[in-house]
């Protein structure tokens, strides 16, 4: 029996898994830029940054595993996509970045040690071994994250959130940057899209499905019911958090001058509110947020790769990916960000369209036709966005692409992909007659 307590614990686990350190440091800059339009901007941010991943989570939980999204593609294409996805969000890019965020934004500001390659290595080893201890057995992930880490993280965030609304640092100023020129809702939508949490939802859907299975919940209708209930808990928590972080950014003019990212704004704000204690609060929030995401993502990666061979079990992959994360994290945060974003720009649109295709799959007259052509077009246009980010896109292609809607926002793929899907449906109906 799945009790109300189980739903709340599962919902808190989902919340913590999605709440990486990046999700905490990104909204304050958006709130600062949105100014007195912060509330509208935060609504747009929540739609694409919270609701889209929530829908993906429900879809994947019903399917049972993220790889079921690719079942209508050629096997090589599905395996290639999922391998790239798990490596990008896992130990090749995102998890080393998470380790570096914890080191540079939580550990170093405490002033306990000097920054050096040796210090970074020691921190990375200890941090990742602690995470590995929580996930070496897959059955402990939900209890560890949902019952232990999340409550501690929520307490710290609640203290900051309440204080921000009770004692804001500054008056809210006029919007700037993209928010001064465009609709706050639209800009917020694009900003929420850039969290790219749909990728994480594909990985975490399997964790939710296994958590439900452990409670003997296998009926598809019950899976949908409980996933929506638990997911709703996480949606409320994430929505409230983003709302508070946008307000923090909007009222940060006194400390935001010269800040280059939301992490700096968040850190300065917390330090201004709490003094020396603020540094420790910041360290606690970033450490717990980083740890929960590291545990969830690496666990999902280990589960996926363990299916390829009985010789290499889940514990083997956890140890392997932990070692890989530790080694790659020595390259530093700046270098990792430089290669992470182009990789994400390449696979994120594919992930979104796979979810869209799954949602309408039963209505497609020719499933294979729609999947093949829609994903092919999505790959082509997402490759353009990726090459543009690397500054290696040929000038001739750039001159053509500037005429496409949303190209400047990194969303050149969206309209062509949706149009291709519609055309494939019409063609499928014609062929089936």
What are the residue ranges of the model-derived segments?
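TM-loop-TM module centered on a large, flexible mid-protein loop between adjacent transmembrane helices
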Residues: 67-71, 241-291, 298, 342
